[in-house]
A protein has these predicted regions:
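Secondary-structure boundary/capping residues
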Residues: 39, 98, 122-125, 137, ...
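Nucleotide 5′-phosphate-binding alpha/beta core
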Residues: 1-88, 94-111, 115-119, 124, ...
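Active-site glycine/GP-rich loop and adjacent strand/helix microenvironment
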Residues: 1-29, 35, 151-340
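Beta-strand-connecting loops/turns
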Residues: 125-126, 281
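AMP-binding/adenylate-forming
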Residues: 103-118, 127-187
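Hydrophobic alpha-helical segments that mediate membrane insertion or helix-helix packing
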Residues: 89-90, 128, 148, 268
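Short aromatic/hydrophobic contact patches that present stacked aromatics
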Residues: 98, 129, 333-335
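Glycine-rich, often proline-containing surface loops adjacent to acidic residues and nearby aromatics
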Residues: 92, 127, 205
Length: 340
């Protein structure tokens, strides 16, 4: 894949034009290599040469988690000899779905988190304490480890759990940044308080948080985020949103007004129950098309996650789409007096 980190600071029109160029490459690749999408294009009489604009994606059916579950192997676009890494994610029908990554896909994954780190203001002067696993077929820990290497940060692979080991590492090596599931920070705070550790005076300045929301739809800290902030006000908390399927992430900048799209890596749509785009200010299902993926690219994949989106320029200088915190999963939302 080609790297273009400056594209996020271009005008919305330039970003859209760039993405449409990458979309054409993705469609050509899918038609040549994906059994699933070859079948879809044939059954629905889709001429990929007519898909020129992001709006034209509406001519193509969506892909669902059930499709992945039932036709897992048909999504694989490369020979087994090209597969370097295997990861899994939960499926809708019980069994996990396997995702395969090539060497190029791992480079893309590394670049994804390089962008995430730079979005939060990290640099090669920082030291990262990795507080999640990089094994057990888990993508995120490996992605952040590789992204930190690409940025040039020092990395301490502590893994998840064991507050005593986490604090011993902080005391010995003085990391400045953590990558963590935010509820674990509560356990770190509790351990520090019981053992007379002044956590607000330690070296840790910020944490990039995965797996759990920290803010509400107004970008204010939610109950979990506020609980951490009240006890550890010196620590900056950055929310993220990601999934194995997209092999990418949305990350907050220092304005804390939503997670930024990485336009080199995915196209995102927000769809209603009829798979039509929702207007800004309306909740929609996050639907993604991967760009630059070799092993298992996805086209109009519905994640099941419902959120709001924002398109106005961010004060950080980026002009990318931003996501709110996830409202919930499709099928778990309820209606009350016309409001989701």
């Amino acid at each position: 894949m080609e790297k273009n980190p400056e594209i996020q600071f271009r005008s919305p029109e330039e970003i859209k034009c760039y993405q449409e160029g990458q979309l054409a490459k993705t469609l050509t690749y899918l038609q040549a290599h994906s059994k699933f999408y070859q079948r879809m294009f044939e059954e629905h009489h889709i001429d990929i040469n007519q898909i020129k604009k992001i709006e034209d994606l509406q001519q193509i059916p969506v892909t669902t988690k059930t499709d992945l579950q039932l036709h897992n192997d048909d999504f694989i676009c490369v020979d087994k000899e090209q597969i370097i890494d295997y990861v899994t994610t939960s499926g809708t029908l019980g069994d996990p779905v396997t995702f395969v990554l090539t060497s190029e896909d791992l480079d893309r994954l590394s670049y994804n988190e390089y962008l995430s780190f730079t979005t939060t203001g990290c640099s090669k002067k920082d030291i990262l304490q990795l507080m999640t696993t990089i094994d057990r077929r888990f993508m995120a820990g490996l992605a952040y480890y590789m992204g930190a290497r690409e940025l040039g940060m020092g990395v301490i692979r502590v893994g998840n759990g064991i507050p005593e080991l986490q604090w011993d590492t902080i005391r010995r090596i003085h990391p400045t940044c953590g990558m963590v599931v935010p509820s674990f920070l509560i356990k770190l705070i509790e351990f520090a308080e019981k053992n007379h550790i002044d956590h607000n005076a330690c070296s840790m300045q910020k944490c990039i948080c995965i797996g759990e929301a920290l803010r509400n739809q107004e970008f204010q800290l939610n109950t979990l985020g506020q609980k951490i902030h009240d006890k550890w006000p010196a620590l900056q908390l950055y929310s993220t949103y990601a999934s194995t399927e997209m092999q990418s992430s949305f990350t907050e900048c220092s304005e804390f007004h939503g997670g930024h799209l990485q336009p080199e890596l995915i196209i995102v749509e927000f769809l209603d129950d009829n798979n039509r785009p929702v207007a800004e200010g309306e909740a929609g299902e996050v639907t993604i098309t991967t760009l630059g993926v070799e092993g298992m690219p996805l086209l109009r994949f519905k994640t099941g996650d419902i959120c709001y989106h924002h398109t106005e320029p961010c004060a950080c200088g980026r002009n990318t789409i931003r996501l709110s915190s996830i409202l919930g999963r499709k099928g778990q939302m309820i209606k009350y007096k016309g409001t989701t």
